[in-house]
Amino acid sequence: MSVFLVRHEHRAEQCPAADFAAGARLLNRLSRTTAARYGVRIRADAVLAAHTLVMIAEADSEDLLRAFLQPFETVGTVEVELASTCARVVAGGGCASSSPVLDATVPALDPEEACQQALDAGLVVHRAHPLNCETPLPALTGGVVMPNARFYVRNHFQIPHLDPAAWRLEVGGLVDRPLSLTLAQVRALPSQSAVATLECAGNGRVGLEPSVPGEQWGVGAVSTAEWTGVALTEVLARAGVKSTAREVVFTAADRGPVEGLDGPIRFERSLSVSQLGSAGALLAYAMNGENLPVLHGYPLRLVVPGWYAVASVKWLTRIELIAQPFRGHFQTDRYHIDGTPVTLQEVRSLVIEPRPGQLVEPGQRVVRGVAWSGAAPICRVEVSIEHGPWQPATLTGEVRRHSWRWWELLARFEGHGDVAVRSRAMDLAGRTQPEQPRWNPLGYANNAIHEVRLTAG
């Protein structure tokens, strides 16, 4: 949905508040329930002067918003201006950049174009078909959210081409009331936003010895965004989950061949019904205040905060409640450790500044990095210089349940030559990064202590 600034003015003799009944009708018009029927969401309203009303509203188009505002036009003037949000400006690179329009149509993305966009954004491309690329460490430096163009990309199959007008979210299986929702209907439901860090389960695979098959991710398959959408539990409550349901299967539109299997398969993952209450899962249609990009699942994706990103199914088309454990390929043959599906992100930290290989002059210098955990908030980060004693770093920024946390330490560098800077994090659940990776055949959940090598002198 696009964000609009609305300004309504009327003359004193036309003031609707002068008539109690007319004023009540306009107040009812501004109610959330009425606005939702018109596909409009009112974020805020204020009276600037005696006869001037200002609103911040969201709608799929200006035409829809003006239809909702028609009663106000009968008693005065209505000006509608396309606006933006702070998250959108930050994600877009600043105030000088053009503001993207959040509408119901996003063009299909050609695979070659997608790869070129990733290269232009400075991402490290591991594979072009399907596109897989990570964010370089220096690009992680900054605020809480990662600009959409620099958000790492993980695909298993080619990017699907979806017509938003024809797209539907089907909810079925063991439910009382099967649903078939259009994108507009999904967006009209009560919305919420969450800042959440997504990390590929294979992040850090390149650090495993002996090496294992799979995309050889460095440590940049992780990014954070503000996701906006509808709570999964809201949609399931409308469908009515039967008491016999045990798992929820999420089916994506992307599909392709898998070695050893007959024919193409779709990407599918599941959550257990018992996990729904604590997962805080969102059906997201916006990312950092703009339309969910095609690369990241437009028109709708699942976001499961705190879990490895394989659970956050992109290009979502169907939700099905089933009575038995789901046995899909990406649930049982991949994304598991010793037979147990990967779920919560392991506690982890990265050294972001100084950069690997950077020349550091003797003396004091700030070491910065980021830390996150799926189980609980980060409570402590420690840094070691050249295998010296562990020193506590200062945690900065706001504490968010499912978002990474920045940290910094004023460290002293002495001598000349190669210097190792290491970081380790702890969370409130008592988990600490291990000294060495926990090797497993598929190369998942490597959260070993991060080390960068610098040159002092």
Model-flagged regions — what are they?
Residues 65-73, 185-186:
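Short amphipathic alpha-helices in soluble, non-transmembrane regions
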Residues 106-457:
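Structured, non-membrane catalytic/scaffold regions adjacent to prosthetic-group chemistry
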Residues 52-54, 77:
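Short active-site oxyanion
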Residues 9, 83, 384-386:
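Predominantly extracellular/luminal cell-surface or secreted proteins
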Residues 74-87:
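Conserved short beta-strand edge segments in small beta-sheet-based binding/regulatory domains
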Residues 41-47, 68-70, 160:
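Short, flexible, solvent-exposed loop/turn segments with mixed acidic/basic and small polar residues
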Residues 1-52, 60-63, 86-101, 105:
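Short S/T/G/P-rich N-terminal loop/turn motif that feeds into the first structured element of a domain
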Residues 47-51, 73, 216-219:
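Short glycine-enriched loop/turn motifs at secondary-structure junctions
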